Swiss-Prot record:
Compartments, as annotated in UniProt: Cytoplasm, Cytosol
Subunit-structure text: Homodimer.
Listed name of the protein: Phosphoserine phosphatase
Active site positions, chain numbering: D20, D22
GO cellular component assignments: cytoplasm; cytosol
Positions where N-acetylmethionine occurs in the chain: M1
Family of this protein: Belongs to the HAD-like hydrolase superfamily. SerB family.
Gene Ontology BP, a term: L-serine metabolic process
Keyword Cytoplasm: yes
Length: 225
């Protein structure tokens, strides 16, 4: 079993760090914000809570929630313009510090690429380092489903992305950071997992993560030492 001090060393020597987005890099759950914007917040929030607790297979939960929301292309664009996601305090500095150390930073999300790319731009993360679900629209902009071939559409999808990154770039040490069960499940193949509870505490993650933080300042401090 890896000790806490070994985990800290792993983090400081990682050549890639992968962040979950909803409730980790940003304060909100993107799908809940979209539901609120489209007027179906209560039903969708309950489904998100069940999905996060691991009670529903991820793809089933995503399909059900999107069937309720039926977001159009215009609604997604208006959401970003009128209610842009809020970055979690400390994330901008942490990502910037990692990039200064030539660590590759990736965003791996079960949320939507259109929202995650908006977040990536704020953090100077290239879109090639973004893995998320793609919404599909008909030619008139109405909702047409989502791309079910994306690894992030499946339970265990974040682990698949990390496995792909290791194979493609030959990273020696990849760290996964996130708030949810799907993030914790990505280790292995990630070499270490850091649980994050700065926006919402998922008890299952808090109880099982070997390293659990509630403020990104703690990780910044590790890099400065």
């Amino acid at each position: 079993m890896v000790s806490h001090s070994e985990l800290r060393k792993l983090f400081c020597s990682a050549d890639a760090v992968c962040f979950d987005v909803d409730s980790t890099v940003i304060r909100e759950e993107g799908i809940d914000e979209l539901a609120k914007f489209c007027g179906v917040e209560a039903a969708v929030s309950e489904m998100t809570r069940r999905a996060m607790g691991g009670a529903l297979p991820f793809k089933d939960a995503l399909t059900e929630r999107l069937a309720l929301i039926q977001p159009s292309r215009d609604q997604v664009q208006r959401l970003l313009a009128e209610h842009p996601p809020h970055l979690t305090p400390g994330i901008r500095e942490l990502v910037s510090r990692l990039q200064e150390r030539n660590v590759q930073v990736f965003l791996i999300s079960g949320g939507f690429r259109s929202i995650v790319e908006h977040v990536a731009a704020k953090l100077n993360i290239p879109t090639t380092n973004v893995f998320a679900n793609r919404l599909k629209f008909y030619f008139n902009g109405e909702y047409a489903g989502f791309d079910e071939t994306q690894p992030t559409a499946e339970s265990g999808g974040k682990g698949k992305v990390i496995g792909f990154l290791k194979e493609k770039f030959h990273f020696k040490k990849i760290i996964m950071i996130g708030d949810g069960a799907t993030d914790m499940e990505a280790c292995p193949p990630a070499d270490a997992f850091i649980g994050f509870g700065g926006n919402v505490i998922r008890q299952q993650v808090k109880d099982n993560a070997k390293w659990y933080i509630t403020d990104f300042v703690e990780l910044l401090g590790e890099l400065e030492e």
